[in-house]
Design a protein with these regions (language model features):
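Bacterial N-terminal signal peptides that target proteins for export
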Residues: 1-7
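C-terminal motif of bacterial Sec signal peptides marking the signal peptidase cleavage site
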Residues: 14-17
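His/Met- and acidic-residue-enriched segments that coordinate or traffic transition-metal cofactors
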Residues: 19-189
């Protein structure tokens, strides 16, 4: 019996990355960021919502269900409003550069490759396959936008910007939940 318990504890420790045997608390990530880091975070958020604001253009080239069309329209409208508000906030002191994401070349290449594959999948699909591709790609984009806004809000010192980021987190989290619900109810087997 003792051997069995020891084996289970060892297996759990190995599978959990030995977190059970960790000797102390992990260091907390610094909440201090430079203006350059913060600006790059805002630029990433701006880039993300700028792409999301075009999601409703799919209806010009593809036929989608009314439910998907309405959902994509909500995402596009939320993203347009968010992009506009980001542009206004970027002009306030201290100003933000919404074009400098400062991503490494390999990250940029990976993102470009993913976008190219997703575009190809969307253009070549129809019906349920089209919907599933659109919904799954939106799911990851909305999740990223919500978490990026949340991370920026955690370090933002300007009250108006912090409030904007918290609203943005809530909006994109709600949209993410709506997309997830659609995906779960329509495509589970």
């Amino acid at each position: 019996m003792l051997l069995r318990v020891s084996a289970v504890v060892l297996a759990v420790g190995l599978l959990s990355g030995c977190a059970l045997f960790d000797s102390g608390p992990k260091p907390v990530a610094s909440t201090y960021v430079t203006l350059s880091d913060s600006s790059a975070g805002y630029a990433l958020l701006y880039e993300t919502v700028s792409k999301q604001k075009r999601t409703n253009l799919l209806s010009y080239i593809k036929k989608e269900t009314p439910e998907l069309k309405a959902l994509l329209e909500r995402i596009a409208e939320t993203s347009r409003a968010t992009a506009d508000e980001l542009e206004a906030l970027a002009k306030a002191a201290p100003p933000l550069n919404l074009t400098a994401t400062r991503l490494p070349k390999m990250e940029l290449a990976a993102r470009e490759s993913i976008e190219k594959d997703t575009r190809k999948d969307i253009l070549e699909s129809k019906g349920v396959d089209l919907e599933f591709t659109m919904v799954s790609s939106q799911l990851s984009g909305l999740n990223y936008a919500a978490h990026l806004a949340r991370s920026l809000a955690a370090v933002e010192t300007s009250a108006p910007r912090k409030a904007f980021l918290q609203r943005t987190d809530r909006k994109y989290s709600q949209l993410h939940d709506q997309v997830y619900k659609m995906m779960y109810t329509r495509y589970r087997s």
